[in-house]
């Protein structure tokens, strides 16, 4: 197996290029790749309006939104409630004029909450803010689906911006600080989101988004033309618990860790999950279809767990030819005391369905 070093592609597998891109910036995850990666692959692989692209771990919706820019049909699966919500909110066909009226209505609303906020949430906000958030959420939930999703995402973003919450791995800590007035922040975010919809030119195609395990996808055999995805990284399970505040703000029900791919800390269990996923991916792809899988070595307290050889073996046994393995990033794996254990690689695997 040949591994080619391509550090020039390193930023493409991070969310950094999309931090200023309209709509993409509404919500990003630490391990998200960029729209630049998806758009580049769509062009290189000649994907068009008659193509179907699948992202079995759709995350923050980057693949789906990039395909919408190109007018390409796409399907996204995930089991994380927040990922499903965000992916759908980013890719709907919105009536911007209608949204403007709804935004005005919500910004002027004075509503009492129908329920009290859970006790655990109050430590993360200035006094009184959770009740104000719940009151507005009640008003938003009366709206039609598209308007409701747009405004709920804006509400959650504003609430987090005005909170005392600070994410430290999988732990949500409290850092009390002075925050700007909530209504002022909410107004700025919602107006910015409206402007994003005007700025990002997309086609009216809407992706299909479903809650579905990537090892059991709901697609006919041989139906997809390409896959662009990034499974959860080995040992990187923080995303399972790190967003519980956002889930509460959006009214979502958290899933148990056992429901997630790679949720077990055992490397062999992770590679077993990967084998199941690769077999399912091979089943739904057309012969000759190309796939891009972004994955990384795992960091444990014992050192670096290399994945490239195992991924190569799994791909070959599942019906793929490995066309390229690109090492695009390397980061030090360290102990909590910052002792260096080795360098962990981040890779782009290009596979072809045999």
Provide a role label for each language-model segment.
Residues 25-29, 116-128, 263-272, 294-309:
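Acceptor-substrate binding/catalytic loop of class I
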Residues 81-143, 251-260:
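Conserved phosphoryl-transfer catalytic core
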